[in-house]
């Protein structure tokens, strides 16, 4: 993304490409139209490309580890700042700032924060709900470093949760 059709065509000609495989599930209409106008046969090969992307060399694994280290550091730090009365939005904003502070280029995706009953929502969008004493908070987040992304989900309690919530958490 972010490169022009001339750049793509130039690289493909440099390699004397005749056929170009693409991820049909991930290509926008504009990108498809750009490729369609070029003198190459287009092959929808999402599975082939996905299978190739699964295999990582040592350098790629190191980049993934960097992204995970950033996310780990940001999460450890944000736990020091979570307090009763803080909103989900405030927690998300603090966390997103920490991703960058610890060396992330960006988030892997929009940070999910759900507190109390919102934690049961599959993809809780952070809202104005204030975190209450005894709430469990669910966060789903990741860091992007050099194009490589981490993804992790964590659940933690703020204050002392009731016995029933502890029992459910431990299932």
Question: How would you label these PLM feature ranges?
Answer:
Residues 1-171:
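Active-site neighborhoods and metal-handling regions in enzymes and metal-associated proteins
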């Amino acid at each position: 993304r972010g490169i022009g059709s001339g750049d793509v065509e130039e690289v493909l000609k440099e390699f004397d490409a005749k056929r170009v495989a693409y991820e049909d599930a991930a290509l926008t209409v504009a990108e498809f139209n750009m490729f369609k106008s070029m003198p190459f046969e287009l092959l929808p090969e999402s599975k082939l490309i996905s299978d190739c992307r699964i295999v990582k060399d040592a350098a790629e694994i190191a980049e993934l580890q960097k992204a995970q280290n950033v996310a780990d550091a940001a999460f450890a730090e944000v736990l020091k700042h979570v307090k009763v009365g803080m909103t989900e939005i405030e927690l998300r904003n603090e966390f997103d700032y920490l991703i960058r502070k610890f060396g992330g280029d960006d988030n892997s995706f929009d940070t999910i924060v759900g507190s109390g009953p919102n934690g049961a929502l599959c993809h809780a969008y952070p809202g104005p709900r204030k975190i209450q004493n005894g709430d469990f908070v669910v966060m789903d987040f990741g860091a992007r470093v050099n194009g490589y992304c981490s993804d992790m989900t964590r659940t933690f309690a703020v204050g002392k949760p009731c016995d029933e919530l502890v029992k459910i958490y431990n299932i």
